């Protein structure tokens, strides 16, 4: 075990009995040979259960849909990448030369996948209870801020339901432009709706984020939101 990986383990708050699991969890498919995709698959499932179990116990009056939206907020790629950056996970990743040169160690999806892989690795190395303890510790500050007011449906869903209830055509989203390097792109999206003379627009670090912002502007233009 190198001093570098020992530093990462201190940040994670967990020391592996089988260090090879940690090395595998940090190995992107671009590196060649065995990679972390299977651990990512396992970690994704373990993470979803840990967060679901926590939310089920904490929000006893919450409906299924509310619990699902709270969980989605916690396990989405943006959140996972944020936590990965708190551990400086990018500097420990094993990437192929091309992926490294293109800034893959900063890419949100790669960081999020690596964090899920580490969760899967801890689960295999120590079992569910230890893994759950670590995950809840990493997510603690974010979990404490959750409340049922956070379960409102996202802007795209609300806009779609508003239009469907009035038997109107669904919104049309179009990417106007994509700017920046692959690891730090900015998407500019237009949303067109029958009945609104002007299209609304939104920008974000992904197409999904930009579409959500454009939908929010449409809700404001329609007078649904204030």
From Swiss-Prot:
GO biological process assignments: mRNA processing; regulation of gene expression; rRNA processing; tRNA processing
HAMAP family: RNase_III
Gene Ontology cellular-component annotations: cytoplasm
Cofactor(s) it depends on: Mg(2+)
Database matches in PROSITE patterns: DS_RBD, RNASE_3_1, RNASE_3_2
Enzyme Commission number(s) of this protein: 3.1.26.3
Gene Ontology molecular function, alphabetical: double-stranded RNA binding; metal ion binding; ribonuclease III activity; rRNA binding
Protein name per UniProt: Ribonuclease 3
Catalytic residues as annotated in Swiss-Prot or TrEMBL: 44, 116
Upper lineage: Bacteria, Pseudomonadati, Pseudomonadota, Gammaproteobacteria, Oceanospirillales
Gene of this entry: rnc
DRBM domain span: 154-224
Oligomeric form and interacting partners: Homodimer.
Family that this chain belongs to: Belongs to the ribonuclease III family.
RNase III domain ranges (all copies): 5-127
